[in-house]
Amino acid sequence: MIRRLSIAAALGAALFAGACQPQADSEGGEAATGDAGVVNLYTARHYASDERIYEAFTEATGIRVRKIELPADQLIERLRAEGEGSPADVVVIQDAGGMGRAAEAGLIVPFEDAVIDERVPEHLRDPQGRWFAIARRARVVAYDTARVRPEEVDTYEELASPRFRGRLCVRSSDNSYNLSLLSALIERWGEERALEWARGIVANMARPPQGGDIEQIRAVGAGQCEVAITNHYYFLRLAESEDAADRDLTSRVALSFPSIGGQGAHFNLSGAGLAANAPNRENAIRFLEFLTGPEAQSTFANETNEFPTVEGADLPADVSRYAGQAADPLPLPAYAARQAQAQRIFEQAGWR
């Protein structure tokens, strides 16, 4: 059933919007409330190439995309604060744990759609129908091919072994990608073993955590460490860089997709869902369907080097090279359910 804002709720939304600093959007203003020609997108994805998807959607449907872009935690807090008066129609977060938290807070709601169900595999859809994956990224190991053999980094466990004492680079524990990885390890191994692993990682750090994933790969290429934890697509971006030095270092670095218990590598997910009080529900559903279509899925693969969630998307050669890697079939609810435990383990292990 389409929910409609009451006059009081609409007034509340207007007052809230007036009290807030405007956020950048694809139309140059704030997201608005109900409008038959608009879909209001709240997104934590920060990729400029996503704008091409919004433009393609508008061209195909005539519906404009009004966007508010914020980091996931701020986006969730804004939705909480806006409550029933929120103008949000669609919520997109680049991390499965963030989507899970939004779902548990009631900020996105279950909906049924045959198109999405047919396109997106069941294991990439929330069991309660609240959200689904739109793109996937693997948490992999970048390693120095001159000093590390592939079989030495074919599991996550090996990264915590004495073999790599003082030879590992990794970013800080407050990064959502590391949080989701540790959440997956807790789900698969249990808390005690995951804590032991995190302590091993801290003992193996070549330097205090610093920089983003690209900086970890560059550190491997520069000989500052032998192995690093990163998302797969950052390596592909360096390989395609206009900077010759970046392209050159990728000839000395390779990727391993480590396995968890023989089931496959950890993949994190960008997800999308229907906002709880969407004033433009019909437009929202059309936009959500569009995200699973061939044009959007091919854009994720070709522009951000992510793995699509739908079969048949056009893949560039570098993404296609890794597309067959096995993925740990982690249940979607586990990403969010284990995050509090993961944060506690990071603190206990001294992973800053």
Can you describe what each PLM-predicted range is?
Residues 194, 305-352:
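An extracytoplasmic/periplasmic, membrane-proximal ligand-sensing/linker region
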Residues 21-100, 352:
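Early extracytoplasmic/lumenal segment of secretory-pathway proteins
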Residues 140-147, 267-280, 299-302:
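A bilobed periplasmic-binding-protein/Venus flytrap-type ligand-binding module shared by bacterial periplasmic
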Residues 86-91, 109-141, 157, 167-170:
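A structural signal for short loop-to-beta-strand junctions that line the ligand-binding cleft
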Residues 16-19:
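C-terminal motif of bacterial Sec signal peptides marking the signal peptidase cleavage site
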Residues 173, 177, 184-258:
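Ligand-binding pocket segment of bilobal, Venus flytrap-like solute-binding proteins
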